């Protein structure tokens, strides 16, 4: 896009950033001071980097799925003699969103992301992945790896796993407590998912087997102070977890809008 168009009010783009090439992006809309809307005709992922920028700037945006659904409905009307209308288009769109949107859990180490994620997967009949569990298949015990290789090396491995899982759809994903310390993880998680932050008092957090949580309650308080703003910047919804997984699962209001 020419810099001469930065005064435009609407941005429409297609092709760049579609799976499996996400999160590629060629346009930085931060320079468009008068932008009022963004349309990206890509439908996989749900939110390209372009749309994530629009979301960050509170600019209305739309992906390509509504166009794809409407096209299919019109084809059915034309070739099969159906009489589907706006109501059917909206229902199909809601159903597809519900089926495809990932549920992402973030929060402090020991807050219960694994327990809650497993319960949500079982309740909704979804495939559940725990990032740390998946990493252990590749690098062995996480605590041992961090001790021997350092946290920076671990975060890079973690980011690679998040990027891999984030391209998929219809999953429940329990992340590690420190994933929010790597900014690029946000785009990988948000592109196809809604991010929920689980919270509970520091005194109730489990520290067993967690090398980065060792040091007792004071260390946990330090982590909480540092990471809370990061969790809040990632999350679309905050859910208090009181160690009752069924109640927490019921409290997660899965939303499929912006």
Task: List each model region and its residues.
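Adenosine-phosphate binding glycine-rich loop
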Residues: 41-101
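NTP-dependent small-molecule kinase module
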Residues: 90-98, 119, 123, 229-256
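Rossmann-like adenosine-cofactor binding region
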Residues: 8-61, 179-185
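Conserved lysine of the Walker
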Residues: 113
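Hydrophobic anchor at the beta1->P-loop junction of P-loop NTPases
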Residues: 105
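Conserved small/polar residues in nucleotide/adenosyl-binding loops
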Residues: 1, 5-14, 257-258
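A glycine- and Lys/Arg-enriched "phosphate-lid" helix/loop adjacent to the NTP-binding pocket
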Residues: 192-230
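ATP-dependent small-molecule kinase phosphotransfer cores
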Residues: 133-190
């Amino acid at each position: 896009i020419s810099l001469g168009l930065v005064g435009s009010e609407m941005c429409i783009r297609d092709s760049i950033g579609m799976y499996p090439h996400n999160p590629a992006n060629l346009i930085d809309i931060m320079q468009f001071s008068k932008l009022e809307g963004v349309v990206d005709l890509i439908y996989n992922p749900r939110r390209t980097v372009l749309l994530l920028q629009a979301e960050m700037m509170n600019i209305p945006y739309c992906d390509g799925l509504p166009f794809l659904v409407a096209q299919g409905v019109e084809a059915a009307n034309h070739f099969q003699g159906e009489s589907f209308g706006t109501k059917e288009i909206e229902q199909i769109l809601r159903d597809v969103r519900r089926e495809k949107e990932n549920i992402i859990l973030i929060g402090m180490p020991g807050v219960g992301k694994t327990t809650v994620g497993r319960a949500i997967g079982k309740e909704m009949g979804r495939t559940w992945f725990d990032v740390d569990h998946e990493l252990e298949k590749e690098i062995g015990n996480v605590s041992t790896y961090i001790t021997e290789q350092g946290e920076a090396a671990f975060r890079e491995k973690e980011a690679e796993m998040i990027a891999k899982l984030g391209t998929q759809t219809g999953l429940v994903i329990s992340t590690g407590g420190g994933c929010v310390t790597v900014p690029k993880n946000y785009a990988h998680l948000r592109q196809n998912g809604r991010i929920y932050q689980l919270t509970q008092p520091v005194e109730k957090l489990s520290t067993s087997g967690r090398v980065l949580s060792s040091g007792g309650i004071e260390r946990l308080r330090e982590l909480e102070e540092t990471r809370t703003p990061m969790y809040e910047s990632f999350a679309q919804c905050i859910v208090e977890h009181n160690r009752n997984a069924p109640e927490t699962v019921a409290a997660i209001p899965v939303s499929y809008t912006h």
